[in-house]
């Protein structure tokens, strides 16, 4: 980013922070705050504020590119080593990024955002609300400002959980170490006598009802979804679909050959024939379809397990997009479009030099841009400059 581009974005950010009444987190004086500045390396950390006005004055003066705060509460948040801060508890943070979703590198920006939102909805509704029983007012949802979503669980039940307890929550959501014998149950349904007292037991493998709570019902619903999806496809398309769930060509063919109309009806009734290959295949695909990616990429420790995590401040701006870290009502999550709803800058035309071809839809406008000079609305210019696709260009 050249100097002119940096100064342009800083002016726009400064104007936003001068006029925005940013809500601070509860017990804000017990939080650590951190900042990354434009054109400067590193992070300014170990800062706390006693008054909201002190914080607002600071961000107007410094105009940071990124603003973070601690999910933890500290007795002394301003101290410069973690052991001296005296930890007092922490919110439970979930950070889903498009880069964590399999195949995201092959998707457009809009497609990646839509995919990660689907996984986020699954996390919030299926796991946090349904399985763990949190109330909606205990879940604070935000668009990250770039490529993902954050969920802050503020329930008193989680504040004192240590890292290992938080890891158990992650393991449950990811389906780690999910046992086949918990999901699939064998039951003796008949005995065949052969003389001299010999009997052969007839076993039936049963799957849970789709309306059961937790992973049992979740697996059942997913199995039925897969079956309904593949039963109307021709053989090659069905094999391709099964392979998309991580199944090999050979195993996919075996599944297709195994599933008859009669077996499909039996599975719908909660019964599946004794076939270890079939049950393992469907369990694997169900896990891949349901499990939510929670680990933070290449970082050493997943965000959710970190009891001292720094997370983006809600309603601050993201320095690489210009988008707002936008709060989202749970009821509106399905319809939330970050490329429309998190855009806060205006339509004033700005002259830029586009450095590489761009194809993106923002604020319901589709832009297909080529390398060269062009006039663009502020919101798009800031987005492209932040991403490194353009820079301010004088007359």
Which ranges hold each PLM region?
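Signature for HUH/AEP ssDNA processing cores
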Residues: 1-144, 155-163, 168, 175-291, ...
